[in-house]
Every structure is written in C-alpha cells, then in structure tokens.
Amino acid sequence: MNDNMSEQEYRSLEKEVQLDDLDFSDLEAKYAVNSDFGMDNYVVVDGAPIAPEAKVPILIKVLKKLFNTVGEVVEGDEGIHMPLQDGKSKGYLFVQFKTPQMAEAAIQQLHGKKLDQKHRLLVNKLSDIEKFGAEGNVEIDFHEPEIPPFKSHGYLRSWLQDEQGRDQMALHFSETVGVYYNKKKNDPEPVIEPRKGFTSKYAKFSPLGTYLFSVHPQGVQSWGGDGFQSITKFIHNQVRLIDFSPNEKYMVTLSPLPIALPDDPAERSIFPFGPESNGHKLVIWDMATGEPARTFALPPHLEGQKDMPWPLVKWSHDDKYCARQGPGALAIYETPSFQLLDKKLVKVDDVVDFEWAPAAVHLSDSKVKEGEYILSYWTPESSNQTARVALMQIPSRKVIRTINLFQVSDCKMHWHGEGKFLCVKVDRHTKSRKTFFSNLEFFKVTEKDIPVEKLELKDVVFNFAWEPRSERFITISRLDDGNQNPSIAKNTISFYAPQVSSKGRVTSSKYTCFKEIHDKHSNTVCWSPKGRFVVVATISKSSGELEFYDCSYEEDKPANSKVNGNVKLLKAEKYSGMTNLAWDPSGRFVAAWSSSWAHSIENGYRLFEFTGNMLKDNSIDHFKEFIWRPRPASLLNAADRKKVRKNLREYSAQFDEADAMEADAASREAILLRRKLLEQWRSYRAKHAANGSKKNEVQAEIIEEIKEEIIEEKEEVVE
C-alpha cells in the first residue's frame, strides 16, 4: 500500500474491496483467544514464603496441592507462576484455574488462609490489579474516615431503679411481644407498647437481664434501654438457636445453613465473616463490638442430626474459658483470643458429656484466693474399662479426682450453684439389663481430698434439683418393675438433707431422706431462687398440677429432728393445660403458662404467690411464652443484708402500705390524705418552734403521740 495515499483515496478503495469474499479462517485459528482462559481464571496470591530458587519447586508443589482443594489448577508451568529475583522467590505467585468459578472459590475460601505461623495467604483476582492499579482508579490522598456520631441507648439497667422494686416480664402472644411490670393481681403495666412482628421465632433475655433478643431469618437483634431501643444486629442467616455466656460478654448462634461469602464485592465488604468462616455454622459473637469472635464447623457426628444437643459451647462462671466437645476430646478456649488452651486439645477417649462448675471452687489445698476453674466429665464403660467420672482443674488440665463405675447406662452431672458440691446421677442396670435403678454420687469439692458420698437407691431417679444456697435437694423417682403405664401414679417425691446438730451445724456427710410422698404423677421440680419454697409440678399432655411446699416449716417440726428441714404442703392447684413454669428473680411469685407452641388448650398464664395463692388467671389466644426478666446479683454486702434483716419489720410496714395503696383506690386516697395532713402539722410545728419561748412563761412540753392501726398483717420469712 502506498504510504502517500490520502484518506479519501483509502476510503474509496475500501468500498471497492469485498471483504466477505476473503477467507480469514487460517488467521483466526492461529490467533484465536480461548475465552475460558481470560483474566477471570487467574488469581494473584500474596504472602507466600520467600524461598531459595532450589526450593521453589517444592513450595509450588505444596501450594498447588492447597489450591487444588478448592478447584482445578491448570497442569504444567502455566498453572502456577512464581516470579524470581536474585535467586529466590518474591513472595507472590499467579495461579491459573480451569474456570472462573474455581478462581472465585479460591478467593472465598483461601483468602486469609494461615499457611504457617508466619505466613498468611492473600488471594485476589488478577483483574483487580488492573482495576486498582490503573492511574485514577484509587485516590492517592488520605481522607479521614467518617465516624458516625455516638448514639446513646440510655442506662441499660434502668429497670433496676424502679421505686417499687418490681420485676419485669415479657409476654409473647400471636405475633406480638410486650414487656410489662408485674402488678400482682392487677393488669401488668406496659413498659413499652407491645410490638407486633417483634420476632420471627422467639424472644429471650440475656442472663443478667441487660438485653432482650429477637430472632429473625437474617439473624439476631438485641434491644435495651428505657424504651428497648435497637442496640446491635448480628447477621447470621436462618439462625435457629442462641445462647449466652454467664456474664453476657458473648453470644452463641447456630444455623442449619453454612456460612457462604457473598459473590458481590460490595456485599462482601460489609459481611461480618471472612473466608476462614466459610462453611461454618456455629458462631461466637462479642457482645460489646457486635463482631464474630470465632466460628466453628459442626462436628461430623452432629451434621444432619435432627435433635441438636444445646448448648454446644459451655462457659466457665466468669466467661474466661469456654469449651466444646468433640469425638474423643474437649476443646477448651481462652477468651478473648479464643485460641485453644496451650494450643492443643484435651484428649478424653469416648467422652460423653462435661459441665463447668457454676462458680469459683475453693479447693482445700489451693492457694488461689479467687478460686479455681473446675470442670467435670464422664466416659462410658468399654470392654476393658469401667465408666469413669473425673474432675479436672483448668488451665493446668490436672485431674484432681476420679471415681470408677460399673454397669452404667447413663450419667447426669448436677453442680450446686455455689460450686461446692457435685451430684452425679448414675443410672445403672442389673447384669441381665432388664431392670434399672439409680445411685447418687456426691463430690464434696471443697473438702480435703474431695470425698465422695454414695447414696444407693432402688428407684430410677429422673429428676434431681439442688436447693439454692443449701445442701438440701429433691428427687423424683419411679420403681422399674416392668409396668411403664404412665396413667398409674407411681412416682415418689423425696426430700433430702444432711444430718445436723441441735445448733444447725452439719454433723454428718450422709444425706437423710426426711420426707417421702408416694404415688404421684409429679415430674418437675422448681426451687425458689431464694431457697426454702419449692414447686413440684405435673406437666403432661393430659393433666397438670402445681404443689407448693415449704421445706423449713417450723410449727410441726419434730423436736428431735436430726435434719434441718420439715416439709409442709401449702397449696395444690390444678392446671390442665400447663406446659411451663418459672419463678421470678425475687422468689415471691411463680408464673405457669400454657403455650400454643405445644397445644391450643387453655392458652394463657397464671400468676401465683410463693405460698400457692393464685393472683391472676389470664387466658390469651395463641399465647406462646412468659419470660421473667433476670436480675444481676445484689450489690449489698453482708453488713447491708444484716441491716435489712434487722429492720425488716419497719420495711414490712412500708411494703404493706404500698400494697394497700395499690390494691384499693379508696385506701390510696386515705393514705395520701393522712400523709398530707401529717406533713402540714410538722411544717406548722417547725415554723412556730423557731420563734422560741418567752421568759418566765410556763414551759410546756409537747408530747406527740401517733397511733398506728394494723389493717392486715402478713408474715414473710426472708432467708
């Protein structure tokens, strides 16, 4: 072609040439670009070890094996290219996959992958180099990030400042959740307007009552403050179960769906999980930041299991440690790093279950003033080994006590709330395996050498409950005689206590049954959080009953009793639709309810005093749940509590007056008028007494006499 041809001549010539008649197939074949091997098939990997040239083939082999776990790397030298400089690798490489989808999977699953202690791989698209490396695509100048203004949620424990000291409860009915103050016989007082659509599944308070949680398909939402404002959103798709550490520092969530990183980069930038969480289902959240602290995959034996054991993560009393159970091992983590204790598992062959002591344990030979962290676990019998229950001290992992058991079918561990005692309920069988019975093994954890007291029984114990702040306990048992007809009342309620002296001191380590009630249908024990009073209930599909007992009844107590206990049935109430019951934190009231989650019979709730007197019977269609709001531990020290007990009569009169005002409007007006007149009289006296008295005047002594009339007298025993 003539280089001096003008543009006009060139265009004229182009029109004359018929390109359709020309065959370009040989050129197209020679210079064809395979669309399957575009830039989307490549990833660039940073953070790889810098190795000498002689060791580069070995490093490439290791990395290729890793990347083949998420896709298929192209064979040959084209699959992985690792640049060299000065006889060693430069710390990054290029990987070519067969499809863009494989490259995307590598980014999602291996970005942030820890190769060893010093190297973490950073995997990105090769096209991102062009995107972010081109001039003008990324700002060079630094701009201060925009920090949103601080938003106060108010005092999160404001309900504790209620002048009347009332407890709150949440009522869940239909699609609505409301929070109310308990007003005894009167209708509950709304704290907030009941909210429709508040939760998709259920609502739950945190252990100390600071937060209320709602569960949704997108995750979990926390609420708190005076008006239950939105606090934090925890994104976990299709979450089903939630649990909390004792001090509310952490929350655990579980979903049947594995975590999957979004494909869209914008969505991924705000997604709370990284590539290391891909495929995991169990999440531990930091409550203060709202960010995931650690995620876990489910153990293989739990995948696809319909009835999931819960909780899967168990906590020490102060949130310092948490533990998970796996096949033949316990994984114990230290917070807040959530790294394995000593970087290794605690090997326990065939471990079935474990429990943390719910309080610091003061071992007799320990020099730790704050107390020790103790957990218990048990392992079953095998062909050459007996069943075993053990106590382990953490973090030393030292096993401080074990007992061997034989002919064991099951064990349940019941720690006392103060961490001083552990009862292991051992279900045993005869050699023929046709008959079952129970033994109770009591570990006296704070005594020297941790003695173990055995209580052998003929019945099968299916319910055991310690009394709070006491060594007494209750069992419900049934004789295994082959007749399992549930309509026959064969259950026995047994009340136990240690032997004591005349001054109330424990004189024997043996437990004595001081009361038995036979031929009952009862199957549930629910102690007052303050002790002494207990509800023994029957919860079944066909019938329901609550029996209120006083376990320290003084009037009919035998003079020569060797135990600190005397049982009196205060009242029995039928409640055929009952599905659940719970004490309020003060130990003054009991709520029992019939949930529409179980059936549609008499849905609603009933409120009782601790003596069994029914205060309220409220039928509510589609009623689901009654939830008392927990309280944190009292701030009063021993001296403060002693002062309260000393002035209990004075406080009792004030409470009776407040109750009278609340119960009757006329009484309220009379009491307020009396207070007003008394205040006017005191003001008048103060005004004229200031003028003083004249000289030589007869000095008069004013005697003020106030008479009190007792309208009603009620006696309450405060432990």
Curated annotation (Swiss-Prot):
WD repeat windows: 194-233, 234-295, 305-343, 346-388, 456-501, 517-559, 573-618
Keyword Repeat annotated: yes
Compartments, record wording: Cytoplasm
GO BP terms: formation of cytoplasmic translation initiation complex
Gene Ontology CC: cytoplasmic stress granule; eukaryotic 43S preinitiation complex; eukaryotic 48S preinitiation complex; eukaryotic translation initiation factor 3 complex, eIF3e; eukaryotic translation initiation factor 3 complex, eIF3m; multi-eIF complex
Keyword presence, Protein biosynthesis: yes
Domain of life: Eukaryota
Region annotation Sufficient for interaction with PIC8: where it falls in the sequence: 1-228
Chief location category: cytoplasm
Region annotated Sufficient for interaction with HCR1 and TIF32, chain positions: 1-102
InterPro entries: EIF3B, eIF3B_RRM, Nucleotide-bd_a/b_plait_sf, RBD_domain_sf, RRM_dom, TIF_beta_prop-like, WD40/YVTN_repeat-like_dom_sf
Record keywords: Coiled coil, Cytoplasm, Initiation factor, Protein biosynthesis, Repeat, RNA-binding, WD repeat
Subunit structure: Component of the eukaryotic translation initiation factor 3 (eIF-3) complex.
Family: Belongs to the eIF-3 subunit B family.
Biological role stated in the UniProt entry: RNA-binding component of the eukaryotic translation initiation factor 3 (eIF-3) complex, which is involved in protein synthesis of a specialized repertoire of mRNAs and, together with other initiation factors, stimulates binding of mRNA and methionyl-tRNAi to the 40S ribosome. The eIF-3 complex specifically targets and initiates translation of a subset of mRNAs involved in cell proliferation.
Protein name (database record): Eukaryotic translation initiation factor 3 subunit B
Native organism taxonomy: Eukaryota, Fungi, Dikarya, Ascomycota, Saccharomycotina
